[in-house]
Amino acid sequence: MCTKIRLWAMVAGWIISTPCLAQGDPNVTRENAQLRQRVETLEKQVEQLQATVKPPAAEPAPVPAPPAAAGLEPGKKPFWSTLDIQFYGYIKLDAAWDSSGVNPGDYVLFTERGREGDDEFNLTARQTRLGLKIQGPSTGNMKASGVVEADFYGSAGAENKPNLLVRHAYMTFDWPEDKFSILAGQTSDVISPLYPNTLNYTVLWDAGNIGYRHPQVRLTQQLSVGNDMTLELAGAISRTIGDAELLNPAFTPGANAGFPTLQGRAGLTYPWFGFKPTVIGVSAHWGREQYSSDEKFDSWSLNLDVLQPICPVVTVKGEAYVGANLDDYFGGIGQGVRTRTVGGTTLFQKAIGDRGGWFAVTLGPWDAWSFNVGAGLDEVESEDVDALARTSNRSLFANAIYALNKSADIGVELSQWRTDFKNADDVDDVRIQTSFIYKF
């Protein structure tokens, strides 16, 4: 554009100089007048062109790169950006009235001897639960994940200042193509994996439902054994925790045994009847507690679990077991080894035999309503316990839960409890519990 302007200027200068060469010729004079008019027109056009010509815009300054995160090399992402982390849980308030004294109070395991008719009222938010689900990173066909979950039923702590209780803290390495997984950490036991849907915190523990949570290393393999049939085999080594360890953490009879507890389960999933497959499992565990060189007691169980969906709104499930020294698995009505105190010294005498089971039916959901009914029974060998000890514990329950929306529930549960004692009167309790639940 600038070159074109200079060319027009040279032409205009040459044209302007021509009148000096031919002033006497009238024709030339006329032509000069025409040329001057054209030059004036060209000058105006040049001015217009100059006005439209703009200098090139300056290039924007480069945007400085954000500073690298502390401890990371340039170009590398923070570790958190490689993981999928989901926060979950619920807030739960339980209000309960009992017609007799129960143990421990905020929830029921069994009734207390000598407290028939001694009613009590409890109000707590300690079952509020918080958790993290972590996914990734994956390598090849292996997927890694983890779970950390806690509530506020930790030991000690005032009711309005509860302590944290770690429920789950485990990682899973899963090979989906091979249907094989490894779990390492604390989570629910391999044995007796089912539980009833109760508002009471302890899901019929010490009343026919055994199985708790322990640190463990677990291997699981799924096998196809026929048309629409799957066999799941799971085996684990887990921490053994004895009676005295529950009262005095410095005394560890489970660790003193020198080896872990062994747990295993075989579960078969197959179409029997109903709209979903039936699941039947057989499981067992064996461990040992050593209190002294002469005091060694085995802990063992043999268990059956059944899950049967009948139709979209009816599901039946239950478990049965037999074993000994099961207090660490919420069996034996909280009694594992028979003890006797002589001269201030506690002597451990015998593992307490135990048997029991439970069943439950889930009804619904219908619109916003769902219902659960069930029963459980735990019976110990009477000859294995001393006088006044608990020999039988039974519970019946029914609840109704109404969903205000997808996150908020209100539930009411009615349960009846009866605990029998050796050479003493049994104690009955009626419990009415209301729960408010907000899930996230």
Give the role of each language-model region.
Residues 17-19:
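N-terminal signal peptide c-region/cleavage motif recognized by signal peptidases
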Residues 80, 121-127, 161-168, 208-212, ...:
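Transmembrane beta-barrel outer-membrane domains
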Residues 402, 427-440:
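Outer-membrane beta-barrel "beta-signal"
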Residues 21-104:
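N-terminal periplasmic/intermembrane-space "pro-region" immediately following the signal or transit peptide
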Residues 259, 264, 270-390, 394:
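Detector for outer-membrane/organellar transmembrane beta-barrel domains
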Residues 104-109, 200-203, 250-253, 297-298, ...:
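Flexible, surface-exposed loop regions and adjacent strand-edge segments
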Residues 73-243, 258-271, 307-311, 317-322, ...:
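Outer membrane beta-barrel
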Residues 98, 137, 152-157, 187-193, ...:
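Sequence/structural signature of outer-membrane beta-barrel proteins
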